[in-house]
Curated annotation (Swiss-Prot):
Chain's role: Core component of the survival motor neuron (SMN) complex that plays an essential role in spliceosomal small nuclear ribonucleoprotein (snRNP) assembly in the cytoplasm, is required for pre-mRNA splicing in the nucleus and acts as a chaperone that discriminates target and non-target RNAs of Sm proteins. A major component of nuclear bodies known as gems (gemini of Cajal bodies) thought to be storage depots of excess SMN complexes. Required for normal expression of spliceosomal snRNAs and for U12 intron splicing.
Family of this protein: Belongs to the SMN family.
Gene it is expressed from: Smn
Protein name as annotated: Survival motor neuron protein
PANTHER family: SURVIVAL MOTOR NEURON PROTEIN, SURVIVAL MOTOR NEURON-LIKE PROTEIN 1
KW Lipid biosynthesis (keyword) present: no
Organism: Drosophila melanogaster
Keywords: Cytoplasm, Developmental protein, mRNA processing, mRNA splicing, Nucleus, Spliceosome
Region Disordered: start-end pairs: 35-68, 137-172
Region (Required for homodimerization): 159-226
Subunit text: Homodimer (via C-terminal region). Component of the core survival motor neuron (SMN) complex composed of Smn, Gem2, Gem3, rig/Gem5 and one of 3 almost identical Gem4 paralogs encoded by Glos/Gem4a, Gem4b or Gem4c. Interacts with Gem3 (via C-terminus); the interaction is direct and stabilizes Smn. Part of a minimal SMN complex composed of Smn and Gem2 only; this complex is active in UsnRNP assembly.
Tree of life domain: Eukaryota
């Protein structure tokens, strides 16, 4: 190999070495910039955390929403046995037990509810809707027995009794659960309709069995002994 060729090879080696050194320096510079950026971001986060901690300590701790308190006469809502919320008025409070008695608007039935389970009312419009629906249901229930009872006298709900032959006193019709106030979906309405049908079916089934047993007992008493 000639001296010129050897010189060319030597020059290439120097070029490669210089390139590698330049790349290494560039990588070191990039690494330093990344490290500086990371350290700066960590310092900013630490400063923000210290500032937030100082604000919390200055105000006496983290702020939390105050619980809603109710008193007698306030409107509130609670979850009934059918899993739906209904509007009512607080009629009494037992501080020792942490409970209150809530009277549902329109239905006039009362339920003991934990104070922590009480929820704020949805407003005047929803309360009025519930009241109108309850009264409509009551009118429909009163019109059905009137058509089927014939000459039976009309008595207040609290003293109403169903007497059958033989002197047996039937219990009053069980209270029908309040209907949906328009806030639930179709599934909830179907569920309440099912409960209503179940209540009515159970009452009239018991009424039929009671009449049948009373009739059988009366027939046995009238049969002369041999």
């Amino acid at each position: 190999m000639s001296d010129e060729t050897n010189a060319a090879v030597w020059d290439d080696s120097l070029l490669v070495k210089t390139y590698d050194e330049s790349v290494g320096l560039a990588r070191e510079a990039l690494a330093r910039r990344l490290a500086d950026s990371t350290n700066k971001r960590e310092e900013e986060n630490a400063a923000a955390a210290e500032e937030e901690a100082g604000e919390i300590s200055a105000t006496g701790g983290a702020t939390s929403p105050e619980p809603v308190s109710f008193k007698v006469g306030d409107y509130a809502r609670a979850t009934y046995v059918d899993g739906v919320d209904y509007e009512g008025a607080v009629v009494s409070i037992n501080e020792e037990k942490g409970t209150c008695v809530l009277r549902y608007l329109g239905y006039e039935n009362e339920q003991e509810v934990l104070l922590v389970d009480l929820l704020p009312s949805w407003g005047k419009r929803v309360r009025r809707e519930q009241f109108l629906i309850a009264k409509k249901d009551e009118d429909e229930q009163l019109s059905r027995p009137k058509a089927s009872a014939g000459s039976h006298s009309k008595t207040p709900k609290s003293s109403r009794r169903s007497r059958i032959s033989g002197g047996l006193v039937m219990p009053p019709m069980p209270p029908v659960p309040p209907m949906i106030v328009g806030q639930g979906d179709g599934a909830e309405q179907d569920f309440v309709a099912m409960l209503t049908a179940w209540y009515m079916s159970g009452y009239y089934t018991g009424l039929y069995q009671g009449k049948k047993e009373a009739s059988t007992t009366s027939g046995k008493k009238k049969t002369p002994k041999k």
